[in-house]
Curated annotation (Swiss-Prot):
Coiled coil start-end: none
Site (Stutter) residue list: 270, 330
Region (Linker 12): 229-251
GO biological process: one example: response to estrogen
Pfam families: Filament
Modified residues (Omega-N-methylarginine): 7, 24, 32, 43, 51
Residue ranges, annotated region (Coil 1B): 137-228
GO cellular component: apicolateral plasma membrane; cell periphery; costamere; cytoskeleton; dystrophin-associated glycoprotein complex; intermediate filament; plasma membrane; sarcolemma
Region (Coil 2): 252-390
Region listing for Necessary for interaction with PNN, in residue ranges: 247-393
Region (Coil 1A): 83-118
Listed GO MF terms: protein-containing complex binding; structural constituent of muscle
Name listed for the protein in its UniProt record: Keratin, type I cytoskeletal 19
Protein backbone atom coordinates (compact mmCIF):
# COMPACT_ATOMS: atom_id res chain seq x y z
CA UNK A 1 0.00 0.00 0.00
CA UNK A 2 1.16 3.51 -0.73
CA UNK A 3 0.91 6.31 1.74
CA UNK A 4 2.18 9.80 1.54
CA UNK A 5 2.17 12.82 3.79
CA UNK A 6 2.94 16.44 3.52
CA UNK A 7 3.03 18.75 6.52
CA UNK A 8 2.46 22.38 5.77
CA UNK A 9 4.24 24.51 8.34
CA UNK A 10 3.50 27.89 6.91
CA UNK A 11 0.52 30.06 7.53
CA UNK A 12 -2.07 31.00 5.00
CA UNK A 13 -4.61 33.74 4.92
CA UNK A 14 -7.59 31.60 4.14
CA UNK A 15 -7.92 27.77 3.75
CA UNK A 16 -10.65 25.20 3.89
CA UNK A 17 -10.09 22.30 6.31
CA UNK A 18 -9.99 18.85 4.80
CA UNK A 19 -11.59 17.02 7.64
CA UNK A 20 -14.64 19.21 7.64
CA UNK A 21 -13.25 21.42 10.43
CA UNK A 22 -13.29 25.17 10.00
CA UNK A 23 -10.26 27.41 9.94
CA UNK A 24 -10.83 30.60 11.84
CA UNK A 25 -9.18 33.92 11.07
CA UNK A 26 -9.49 36.65 13.71
CA UNK A 27 -7.73 39.61 15.13
CA UNK A 28 -5.11 38.35 17.45
CA UNK A 29 -6.47 34.88 16.76
CA UNK A 30 -4.81 31.67 15.79
CA UNK A 31 -4.25 30.55 12.23
CA UNK A 32 -3.39 26.94 11.38
CA UNK A 33 -1.70 26.31 8.05
CA UNK A 34 -2.91 22.90 6.97
CA UNK A 35 -0.75 20.00 5.85
CA UNK A 36 -1.98 16.89 4.06
CA UNK A 37 -1.62 13.29 5.27
CA UNK A 38 -2.89 10.82 2.70
CA UNK A 39 -3.65 7.31 3.85
CA UNK A 40 -3.99 4.10 1.86
CA UNK A 41 -6.52 4.48 -0.90
CA UNK A 42 -7.05 8.06 -0.02
CA UNK A 43 -8.78 7.04 3.22
CA UNK A 44 -8.05 8.94 6.39
CA UNK A 45 -6.66 12.04 4.70
CA UNK A 46 -6.19 14.64 7.42
CA UNK A 47 -4.94 18.18 7.60
CA UNK A 48 -2.66 19.47 10.34
CA UNK A 49 -1.50 23.02 10.80
CA UNK A 50 0.99 25.13 12.70
CA UNK A 51 -0.05 28.00 14.87
CA UNK A 52 0.68 31.62 13.99
CA UNK A 53 -0.64 34.81 15.50
CA UNK A 54 -2.89 36.80 13.25
CA UNK A 55 -4.49 40.14 13.70
CA UNK A 56 -6.69 40.03 10.72
CA UNK A 57 -10.37 39.81 10.87
CA UNK A 58 -11.53 36.25 11.07
CA UNK A 59 -13.77 34.17 9.01
CA UNK A 60 -14.71 30.56 8.66
CA UNK A 61 -13.92 28.46 5.68
CA UNK A 62 -15.41 24.98 5.51
CA UNK A 63 -14.11 22.09 3.50
CA UNK A 64 -14.86 18.42 2.89
CA UNK A 65 -12.71 15.59 4.26
CA UNK A 66 -10.09 14.06 1.99
CA UNK A 67 -10.14 16.82 -0.68
CA UNK A 68 -9.61 20.48 -1.37
CA UNK A 69 -12.98 20.95 -3.01
CA UNK A 70 -14.18 23.54 -0.51
CA UNK A 71 -14.29 27.14 -1.59
CA UNK A 72 -11.29 29.23 -0.71
CA UNK A 73 -12.36 32.67 0.61
CA UNK A 74 -10.01 35.39 1.59
CA UNK A 75 -10.26 39.09 2.18
CA UNK A 76 -10.14 41.39 -0.76
CA UNK A 77 -6.69 42.16 -1.93
CA UNK A 78 -5.14 39.14 -0.18
CA UNK A 79 -4.81 37.03 -3.33
CA UNK A 80 -4.59 38.17 -6.88
CA UNK A 81 -6.98 37.00 -9.54
CA UNK A 82 -4.47 34.70 -11.27
CA UNK A 83 -3.32 33.24 -7.99
CA UNK A 84 -6.90 32.50 -7.00
CA UNK A 85 -7.51 30.74 -10.26
CA UNK A 86 -4.22 28.83 -9.95
CA UNK A 87 -5.03 27.73 -6.42
CA UNK A 88 -8.55 26.76 -7.47
CA UNK A 89 -7.14 24.68 -10.33
CA UNK A 90 -4.60 23.13 -8.00
CA UNK A 91 -7.33 22.38 -5.51
CA UNK A 92 -9.48 20.72 -8.18
CA UNK A 93 -6.56 18.76 -9.60
CA UNK A 94 -5.50 17.69 -6.11
CA UNK A 95 -9.00 16.42 -5.41
CA UNK A 96 -9.04 14.59 -8.73
CA UNK A 97 -5.60 13.06 -8.05
CA UNK A 98 -6.65 12.01 -4.58
CA UNK A 99 -9.74 10.34 -6.02
CA UNK A 100 -7.60 8.54 -8.58
CA UNK A 101 -5.08 7.55 -5.92
CA UNK A 102 -7.87 6.31 -3.69
CA UNK A 103 -9.42 4.29 -6.53
CA UNK A 104 -6.08 2.84 -7.64
CA UNK A 105 -5.02 1.95 -4.11
CA UNK A 106 -8.41 0.39 -3.49
CA UNK A 107 -8.07 -1.64 -6.70
CA UNK A 108 -4.51 -2.54 -5.70
CA UNK A 109 -5.74 -3.67 -2.28
CA UNK A 110 -8.48 -5.76 -3.86
CA UNK A 111 -5.96 -7.36 -6.23
CA UNK A 112 -3.60 -8.08 -3.36
CA UNK A 113 -6.45 -9.65 -1.40
CA UNK A 114 -7.36 -11.74 -4.44
CA UNK A 115 -3.73 -12.80 -4.92
CA UNK A 116 -3.41 -13.67 -1.24
CA UNK A 117 -6.67 -15.65 -1.38
CA UNK A 118 -5.52 -17.38 -4.54
CA UNK A 119 -2.19 -18.30 -2.94
CA UNK A 120 -4.04 -19.58 0.11
CA UNK A 121 -6.32 -21.68 -2.09
CA UNK A 122 -4.00 -22.60 -4.94
CA UNK A 123 -0.63 -22.18 -3.33
CA UNK A 124 1.62 -25.13 -2.54
CA UNK A 125 0.42 -27.00 0.51
CA UNK A 126 0.82 -30.51 1.93
CA UNK A 127 -1.52 -31.85 -0.73
CA UNK A 128 0.47 -29.97 -3.43
CA UNK A 129 3.82 -31.34 -2.30
CA UNK A 130 5.06 -33.36 -5.25
CA UNK A 131 8.30 -34.47 -3.60
CA UNK A 132 6.72 -37.77 -2.62
CA UNK A 133 5.67 -38.23 -6.25
CA UNK A 134 9.22 -37.49 -7.35
CA UNK A 135 10.53 -40.14 -4.96
CA UNK A 136 7.88 -42.56 -6.23
CA UNK A 137 8.83 -41.72 -9.81
CA UNK A 138 12.51 -42.29 -9.02
CA UNK A 139 11.65 -45.60 -7.34
CA UNK A 140 9.56 -46.62 -10.33
CA UNK A 141 12.32 -45.61 -12.70
CA UNK A 142 14.75 -47.70 -10.65
CA UNK A 143 12.30 -50.61 -10.75
CA UNK A 144 11.84 -50.22 -14.50
CA UNK A 145 15.62 -50.07 -14.92
CA UNK A 146 16.02 -53.16 -12.73
CA UNK A 147 13.28 -54.96 -14.66
CA UNK A 148 14.97 -53.95 -17.93
CA UNK A 149 18.31 -55.27 -16.65
CA UNK A 150 16.63 -58.46 -15.43
CA UNK A 151 14.89 -58.78 -18.79
CA UNK A 152 18.25 -58.36 -20.52
CA UNK A 153 19.72 -61.04 -18.28
CA UNK A 154 16.81 -63.34 -19.08
CA UNK A 155 17.23 -62.62 -22.80
CA UNK A 156 20.94 -63.43 -22.42
CA UNK A 157 20.06 -66.64 -20.57
CA UNK A 158 17.56 -67.50 -23.30
CA UNK A 159 20.23 -66.89 -25.94
CA UNK A 160 22.66 -69.05 -23.98
CA UNK A 161 19.99 -71.74 -23.64
CA UNK A 162 19.28 -71.49 -27.36
CA UNK A 163 22.98 -71.83 -28.14
CA UNK A 164 23.23 -74.78 -25.74
CA UNK A 165 20.16 -76.31 -27.38
CA UNK A 166 21.76 -75.83 -30.80
CA UNK A 167 24.95 -77.42 -29.48
CA UNK A 168 23.01 -80.34 -28.04
CA UNK A 169 21.06 -80.60 -31.28
CA UNK A 170 24.34 -80.77 -33.20
CA UNK A 171 25.63 -83.40 -30.80
CA UNK A 172 22.34 -85.25 -31.12
CA UNK A 173 22.57 -85.19 -34.90
CA UNK A 174 26.18 -86.42 -34.67
CA UNK A 175 25.20 -89.18 -32.27
CA UNK A 176 22.23 -90.02 -34.46
CA UNK A 177 24.54 -90.29 -37.48
CA UNK A 178 26.87 -92.46 -35.39
CA UNK A 179 23.90 -94.52 -34.30
CA UNK A 180 22.82 -94.97 -37.90
CA UNK A 181 26.39 -95.99 -38.78
CA UNK A 182 26.44 -98.47 -35.90
CA UNK A 183 23.05 -99.80 -36.97
CA UNK A 184 24.40 -100.17 -40.50
CA UNK A 185 27.40 -102.04 -39.06
CA UNK A 186 25.03 -104.17 -37.01
CA UNK A 187 22.99 -104.92 -40.11
CA UNK A 188 26.22 -105.87 -41.91
CA UNK A 189 27.22 -108.07 -38.97
CA UNK A 190 23.78 -109.61 -39.03
CA UNK A 191 24.28 -110.44 -42.67
CA UNK A 192 27.70 -111.90 -41.77
CA UNK A 193 26.01 -113.80 -38.93
CA UNK A 194 23.42 -115.12 -41.37
CA UNK A 195 26.20 -116.15 -43.73
CA UNK A 196 28.05 -117.80 -40.85
CA UNK A 197 24.84 -119.53 -39.82
CA UNK A 198 24.41 -120.79 -43.35
CA UNK A 199 28.06 -121.89 -43.37
CA UNK A 200 27.54 -123.60 -40.01
CA UNK A 201 24.47 -125.36 -41.38
CA UNK A 202 26.46 -126.36 -44.44
CA UNK A 203 29.27 -127.64 -42.24
CA UNK A 204 26.82 -129.55 -40.09
CA UNK A 205 25.36 -131.08 -43.23
CA UNK A 206 28.86 -131.95 -44.41
CA UNK A 207 29.60 -133.48 -41.00
CA UNK A 208 26.41 -135.51 -41.24
CA UNK A 209 27.36 -136.61 -44.74
CA UNK A 210 30.82 -137.51 -43.52
CA UNK A 211 29.32 -139.45 -40.63
CA UNK A 212 27.00 -141.27 -43.01
CA UNK A 213 29.90 -141.91 -45.34
CA UNK A 214 31.98 -143.09 -42.40
CA UNK A 215 29.18 -145.43 -41.31
CA UNK A 216 28.85 -146.64 -44.87
CA UNK A 217 32.59 -147.20 -45.12
CA UNK A 218 32.59 -148.98 -41.77
CA UNK A 219 29.79 -151.18 -42.97
CA UNK A 220 31.56 -151.95 -46.24
CA UNK A 221 34.75 -152.51 -44.33
CA UNK A 222 33.06 -154.96 -42.02
CA UNK A 223 31.47 -156.69 -44.97
CA UNK A 224 34.80 -156.93 -46.74
CA UNK A 225 36.43 -158.17 -43.55
CA UNK A 226 33.71 -160.77 -43.19
CA UNK A 227 34.15 -161.80 -46.80
CA UNK A 228 37.89 -161.94 -46.41
CA UNK A 229 37.56 -163.90 -43.20
CA UNK A 230 35.30 -166.37 -44.90
CA UNK A 231 37.75 -166.68 -47.76
CA UNK A 232 40.71 -166.99 -45.41
CA UNK A 233 38.95 -169.63 -43.38
CA UNK A 234 38.29 -171.67 -46.50
CA UNK A 235 41.90 -171.43 -47.63
CA UNK A 236 43.17 -172.46 -44.23
CA UNK A 237 41.05 -175.52 -44.30
CA UNK A 238 42.26 -176.44 -47.77
CA UNK A 239 45.92 -175.59 -47.57
CA UNK A 240 46.98 -176.73 -44.19
CA UNK A 241 50.58 -177.27 -44.87
CA UNK A 242 51.20 -174.21 -47.00
CA UNK A 243 53.43 -171.30 -45.92
CA UNK A 244 51.83 -168.65 -43.68
CA UNK A 245 50.11 -165.82 -45.70
CA UNK A 246 49.68 -162.12 -45.07
CA UNK A 247 47.74 -161.16 -41.95
CA UNK A 248 44.86 -159.34 -43.63
CA UNK A 249 43.06 -158.72 -40.38
CA UNK A 250 45.98 -156.78 -39.06
CA UNK A 251 46.29 -154.84 -42.28
CA UNK A 252 42.58 -154.06 -42.27
CA UNK A 253 42.79 -153.11 -38.62
CA UNK A 254 45.63 -150.73 -39.34
CA UNK A 255 43.80 -149.27 -42.32
CA UNK A 256 40.70 -148.83 -40.23
CA UNK A 257 42.72 -147.18 -37.47
CA UNK A 258 44.34 -144.81 -39.94
CA UNK A 259 41.00 -144.00 -41.56
CA UNK A 260 39.35 -143.45 -38.20
CA UNK A 261 42.25 -141.27 -37.11
CA UNK A 262 42.00 -139.21 -40.28
CA UNK A 263 38.21 -138.94 -39.91
CA UNK A 264 38.57 -137.95 -36.24
CA UNK A 265 41.22 -135.39 -37.14
CA UNK A 266 39.04 -133.91 -39.88
CA UNK A 267 36.08 -133.85 -37.52
CA UNK A 268 38.07 -132.16 -34.77
CA UNK A 269 39.54 -129.65 -37.22
CA UNK A 270 36.10 -128.82 -38.61
CA UNK A 271 34.63 -128.60 -35.13
CA UNK A 272 37.51 -126.42 -33.91
CA UNK A 273 37.17 -124.10 -36.92
CA UNK A 274 33.42 -123.95 -36.41
CA UNK A 275 33.82 -123.20 -32.69
CA UNK A 276 36.46 -120.57 -33.47
CA UNK A 277 34.17 -118.85 -35.97
CA UNK A 278 31.26 -119.06 -33.55
CA UNK A 279 33.36 -117.57 -30.74
CA UNK A 280 34.58 -114.75 -32.97
CA UNK A 281 31.03 -114.01 -34.11
CA UNK A 282 29.75 -114.15 -30.54
CA UNK A 283 32.55 -111.82 -29.44
CA UNK A 284 31.78 -109.36 -32.23
CA UNK A 285 28.06 -109.58 -31.53
CA UNK A 286 28.68 -109.01 -27.81
CA UNK A 287 30.96 -106.03 -28.51
CA UNK A 288 28.53 -104.48 -30.95
CA UNK A 289 25.61 -105.23 -28.64
CA UNK A 290 27.42 -103.46 -25.80
CA UNK A 291 28.21 -100.53 -28.09
CA UNK A 292 24.59 -100.45 -29.23
CA UNK A 293 23.40 -100.42 -25.63
CA UNK A 294 25.86 -97.61 -24.82
CA UNK A 295 24.72 -95.67 -27.87
CA UNK A 296 21.08 -96.27 -26.98
CA UNK A 297 21.77 -95.05 -23.43
CA UNK A 298 23.54 -91.95 -24.75
CA UNK A 299 20.74 -91.27 -27.22
CA UNK A 300 18.16 -91.66 -24.44
CA UNK A 301 20.16 -89.31 -22.20
CA UNK A 302 20.51 -86.78 -25.01
CA UNK A 303 16.79 -86.98 -25.74
CA UNK A 304 16.07 -86.39 -22.07
CA UNK A 305 18.45 -83.42 -22.00
CA UNK A 306 16.90 -82.01 -25.16
CA UNK A 307 13.43 -82.37 -23.64
CA UNK A 308 14.63 -80.70 -20.43
CA UNK A 309 16.18 -77.87 -22.43
CA UNK A 310 13.02 -77.47 -24.50
CA UNK A 311 10.95 -77.36 -21.31
CA UNK A 312 13.35 -74.83 -19.79
CA UNK A 313 13.28 -72.82 -23.02
CA UNK A 314 9.49 -72.76 -22.99
CA UNK A 315 9.56 -71.75 -19.32
CA UNK A 316 12.05 -68.95 -20.04
CA UNK A 317 9.98 -67.79 -23.01
CA UNK A 318 6.85 -67.77 -20.85
CA UNK A 319 8.72 -65.88 -18.14
CA UNK A 320 10.01 -63.44 -20.75
CA UNK A 321 6.50 -62.88 -22.12
CA UNK A 322 5.16 -62.40 -18.57
CA UNK A 323 7.95 -59.95 -17.70
CA UNK A 324 7.43 -58.05 -20.95
CA UNK A 325 3.71 -57.86 -20.18
CA UNK A 326 4.48 -56.68 -16.63
CA UNK A 327 6.95 -54.08 -17.90
CA UNK A 328 4.45 -52.87 -20.50
CA UNK A 329 1.73 -52.66 -17.84
CA UNK A 330 4.03 -50.78 -15.44
CA UNK A 331 5.13 -48.41 -18.20
CA UNK A 332 1.51 -47.81 -19.23
CA UNK A 333 0.34 -47.28 -15.64
CA UNK A 334 3.16 -45.00 -14.60
CA UNK A 335 3.15 -43.34 -17.99
CA UNK A 336 -0.47 -42.36 -17.30
CA UNK A 337 0.53 -41.15 -13.84
CA UNK A 338 3.43 -39.18 -15.30
CA UNK A 339 1.09 -37.70 -17.90
CA UNK A 340 -1.32 -36.69 -15.13
CA UNK A 341 1.51 -35.19 -13.07
CA UNK A 342 2.83 -33.37 -16.13
CA UNK A 343 -0.68 -32.07 -16.77
CA UNK A 344 -0.87 -30.85 -13.16
CA UNK A 345 2.57 -29.26 -13.51
CA UNK A 346 1.52 -27.62 -16.78
CA UNK A 347 -1.64 -26.31 -15.11
CA UNK A 348 0.40 -24.94 -12.20
CA UNK A 349 2.85 -23.37 -14.66
CA UNK A 350 -0.07 -21.73 -16.46
CA UNK A 351 -1.39 -20.48 -13.12
CA UNK A 352 2.07 -19.19 -12.22
CA UNK A 353 2.26 -17.47 -15.61
CA UNK A 354 -1.10 -15.84 -14.92
CA UNK A 355 0.12 -14.81 -11.47
CA UNK A 356 3.29 -13.38 -13.00
CA UNK A 357 1.20 -11.51 -15.57
CA UNK A 358 -1.05 -10.15 -12.80
CA UNK A 359 2.03 -9.19 -10.80
CA UNK A 360 3.52 -7.42 -13.81
CA UNK A 361 0.25 -5.63 -14.41
CA UNK A 362 0.06 -4.62 -10.74
CA UNK A 363 3.68 -3.45 -10.90
CA UNK A 364 2.81 -1.33 -13.90
CA UNK A 365 -0.21 0.08 -12.07
CA UNK A 366 1.98 0.67 -9.04
CA UNK A 367 4.52 2.51 -11.19
CA UNK A 368 1.71 4.58 -12.65
CA UNK A 369 0.51 5.27 -9.12
CA UNK A 370 4.01 6.28 -8.06
CA UNK A 371 4.22 8.57 -11.08
CA UNK A 372 0.91 10.11 -10.08
CA UNK A 373 2.21 10.44 -6.53
CA UNK A 374 5.37 12.16 -7.80
CA UNK A 375 3.35 14.59 -9.88
CA UNK A 376 1.04 15.12 -6.91
CA UNK A 377 4.00 15.85 -4.64
CA UNK A 378 5.31 18.28 -7.23
CA UNK A 379 1.94 20.02 -7.35
CA UNK A 380 1.78 20.01 -3.54
CA UNK A 381 5.24 21.61 -3.52
CA UNK A 382 3.94 24.21 -5.96
CA UNK A 383 0.88 24.69 -3.77
CA UNK A 384 3.14 25.06 -0.75
CA UNK A 385 5.25 27.69 -2.49
CA UNK A 386 2.05 29.59 -3.29
CA UNK A 387 0.92 29.28 0.31
CA UNK A 388 4.30 30.49 1.53
CA UNK A 389 4.07 33.43 -0.85
CA UNK A 390 0.59 34.25 0.46
CA UNK A 391 1.87 33.84 4.03
CA UNK A 392 4.69 36.29 3.38
CA UNK A 393 2.22 38.69 1.82
CA UNK A 394 -0.11 38.29 4.76
CA UNK A 395 2.72 38.86 7.24
CA UNK A 396 3.75 42.01 5.42
CA UNK A 397 0.19 43.27 5.54
CA UNK A 398 -0.04 42.45 9.23
CA UNK A 399 3.19 44.30 9.93
CA UNK A 400 1.98 47.24 7.87
CA UNK A 401 -1.28 47.39 9.80
CA UNK A 402 0.53 47.08 13.08
CA UNK A 403 2.72 50.01 12.20
Amino acid sequence: MTSYSYRQSSAMSSYGGMGGGPVRFGSGGVFRAPSIHGGSGGRGVSVSSTRIVSSSSGGYVGGRGGSFSGALTVTDGLLGGNEKITMQNLNDRLASYLDKVRALEQANGELEVKIRDWYQKQGPGPFRDYSQYFKTIEDLRDKILGATIENSKIVLQIDNARLAADDFRTKFETEQALRMSVEADINGLRRVLDELTLARTDLEMQIENLKEELAYLKKNHEEEISALRSQVGGQVSVEVDSTPGIDLAKILSEMRSQYEAMAEKNRKDAEAWYLTQIDELNTQVAVHTTQIQINKTEVTELRRKVQDLEIELQSQLSMKAALEGTVAEIEARYGAQLSHIQGVISSIEVQLSNVRADTERQNQEYQQLMDIKSRLEQEIATYRSLLEGQEAHYNSLSIAKAL
